[in-house]
Amino acid sequence: MEDLAVEVRGSNGAYYKGFVKDVHEDSLTVVFENNWQPERQVPFHEVRMPPLPDIKKEITEGDEVEVYSRANDQEPCGWWLAKVRMMKGEFYVIEYAACDATYNEIVTFERLRPGNQNKSVTKSSFFKCTVDVPEDLREPCSNENVHKEFKKAVGACRVYFHAETNQLIILSACESTVKRVTILSDMHLRSIRTKLMLMSRNEEATKHLECTKQLAAAFHEEFVVREDLMGLAIGTHGSNIQQARKVPGITAIELDEDSGTFRIYGESAEAVKKARSYLEFVEDFIQVPRNLVGKVIGKNGKVIQEIVDKSGVVRVRIEGDNETKLPREDGMVPFVFVGTKESIGNVQVLLEYHIAYLKEVEQLRMERLQIDEQLRQIGMGFRPSSSRGTEKEKGYATDESTASSVRGSRSYSGRGRGRRGPNYTSGYGTNSELSNPSETESERKEELSDWSLAGEDERESRQQRDSRRRPGGRGRSGSAGRGRGGSRGGKSSISSVLKDPDSNPYSLLDNTESDQTADTDASESHHNTNRRRRSRRRRTDEDSSLMDGMTESDNASVNENGLDDSEQKPQRRNRSRRRRFRGQAEDRQPVTVADYISRAESQSRQRNLPKEPLAKGKKEKVKDVIEEHGPSEKVINGPRAASADKALKPQTTERNKASCQDGSKQEAILNGVS
């Protein structure tokens, strides 16, 4: 600001040093040295330029000079007009001209100068230029040090930013300054913007340096994430990084995208580890036995999806046989999981537990199969064997007995046609297919031949009663399935289905009866129509039946009596009272291995008995059975104990085959008379 120095005349005639701040039409805005007076506007005629600094000081007696002095202690020094009266060495005696009274003073040569010959300034004494400043540069332009080089280049006396007009003011006493300002103004503003950006970067670098110094002494961890997993680590729009930065105690998180390196700084080790758990994504694999892959995946991927959801992994992939990226063990299939380290640990726990569970289930199933095989080999037991072809055809969570029942698997034993599904095991006391061991191969052949010759109506009548039999076996009791002692009344559900294959086979199960909850062996007391609830399995030509051998003789008996099936079918009497004649041995009891062994021994003893007494015993038993159907109905091979006080109605009883090895013909029983 020394270049803008002027001298302002005071009220006492002395000139005081000041600085021009702005130029107006007829005045100047002047700031006084040391601010001894406030800033004010001074007319041009009271302001003059100071003399040139290189002027020679040649002072003699009688010259008019200016003395640098002050009138009192409250005012600063100024240039007062005086006249030299006498000289003596370095000292001068001067007389002030501005004072009314004569005032002399002795001063040194340094306080004297020749009189200032400059006249008062005018409007043309100063040149003023303005430059508009962009908004982003207004703040930096307010610092006058920014314009230091620009001021020197244009030769200006002063350059400053005017906040009210948002302009850069350039003041100069030279006319050439105006042209230079026009040329350099744009360049000056660009340089300010560049310097501002560099200064900002330097400030950020300084702050980063200070922060790094602080973080160096704090907790930090560094880890690398694979390039293909970097997107998962960063998250959508950097969500994972933001979540990690919100962890209390985290001061900074740095990411080097080129190398995939994360650096986490925090105030505590716990905070750093927690933030790392959000960002560290890895890929790991778990070996799964090949035979358990399907069960680990589950139906429609339900099991593996549950494992993925609970563990929190991002995705799972099963390594193919043609892929050799991962090490593979014999009989194992790698499951590749992608996620955070915590989620990978969770999926390992879940998968290892599930595989252990599947192995235990497989072990139990194999033990079950071994037990069933032993039962079949020991005593022709009625335990069912699984007819499912391969392990892949069943779900691993399916119960063995239920699956066997659905598929209608056959029992291990080989005699008789009264076998049901696996749910109809020998859980009904002594009603097993081993209860009557007297049937021989010759009887089976005769039954098969008689069955093929029997009339269709009589087959239906016989089959209908068979459908009502309770599952259990081939015993003589009325509740036996399709054994020798089974009833022959009613129509067969199997025959009706064979007649009309397009009909609904489940319509046979529609009828119910009041005594449905009675004992299993009391099922013979139900009506013929309700006997369809439990139909037998479909017979083949190779299967033989006791009823087959009775078909011809029964048809003949009906024709001899002249009875028609549709006319003489009296209402059947409710025979549920028969259950009171049943022994306790026929109650349902769980079958054990000892039962199978005892039945096998009993069968072997009974096979040694003569065939003829057994045949006679059968005839005597049949005579005691009460049958309330017409002549076309067959007597059920039911309980031997019947009520003696009830009158016998005309009926057709069941004829029994004599199991003779010489192939003797069967005798028919008609109306209770052989």
Curated annotation (Swiss-Prot):
CDD domains: KH_I_FXR1_rpt1 (cd22504), KH_I_FXR1_rpt2 (cd22507), KH_I_FXR1_rpt3 (cd22510), Tudor_Agenet_FXR1_rpt2 (cd20475)
Biased composition (Polar residues): 423-439
Pfam families the UniProt entry points to: Agenet, FXMRP1_C_core, FXR_C1, FXR_C3, KH_1, KH_9, Tudor_FRX1
Biased composition (Acidic residues): 512-522
GO biological process: dentate gyrus development; membraneless organelle assembly; mRNA destabilization; muscle organ development; negative regulation of inflammatory response; negative regulation of long-term synaptic potentiation; negative regulation of translation; negative regulation of tumor necrosis factor production
Keywords: Cytoplasm, Developmental protein, Differentiation, Myogenesis, Nucleus, Repeat, RNA-binding
Entry GO CC: cytoplasm; cytoplasmic stress granule; intracellular membraneless organelle; nucleus
Domain notes per entry: Disordered region at the C-terminus undergoes liquid-liquid phase separation (LLPS) for the formation of a membraneless compartment that stores mRNAs. CC1 and CC2 domains are required for homodimerization and FXR1-network nucleation. CC domains also mediate interaction with other proteins containing similar CC domains.
Protein name: RNA-binding protein fxr1
Species whose genome carries this gene: Xenopus tropicalis
Source species taxonomy: Eukaryota, Metazoa, Chordata, Craniata, Vertebrata
